[in-house]
Amino acid sequence: MFSGIVETTARVLRMDHPHGSTNVDITLTVPFWDELAIDQSVAHNGVCLTVVSIHPEEKSYTVTAVQETLQRSNLGDLRPGDRVNVERSMRSDGRLDGHIVQGHVDTTAECIGLEDVGGSTYYTFRYSVTDEMAARGYTTVEKGSVCINGVSLTVVDSERDTFKVAIIPYTKEITNFGDLSEGKRVNLEFDIIGKYLAKLITFRQ
């Protein structure tokens, strides 16, 4: 489990396709590389991935993304040099400063607008939503929580297939929101509490 409080960004060094496999091995460098361990869970742009190898000589580590993950997230869009938001899994005695994040991306959204207002940046996103998705809780709620590229954020405006969030300068600096521009895709994980409530309502109908 994660909290959506990004620790830092990792830099993609290379994307390798193992022979005969549809998986992709992603090698990244990050300041706390020497604190990582094989089999450890780390969220990358909100996607929970397992550390499969560590490379002390280049201060890097490798994770593997399967085809399902590549299709459902924006990890397949990554190129060497790109920055990725990273967060290690929560400790049992840690604080939940964001909201409950599973690291299971639901879908992607497209950034369709940026506006600087009073020192903060407002980002508008659009995503495809069907009646079935909405009934399963795959939606946003004004003043509710949503996880975007692994960042726990509060929705400031919500419509059926669009929503808006506000990013303060600090968050923009320590995450890859500073690299985000119109037309780029981001990963979305909707609030798990909302999804459970939607499921409960469906059962009762």
Question: Which residue stretches match the model-derived regions?
Answer:
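Conserved loop->alpha-helix
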Residues: 1-205
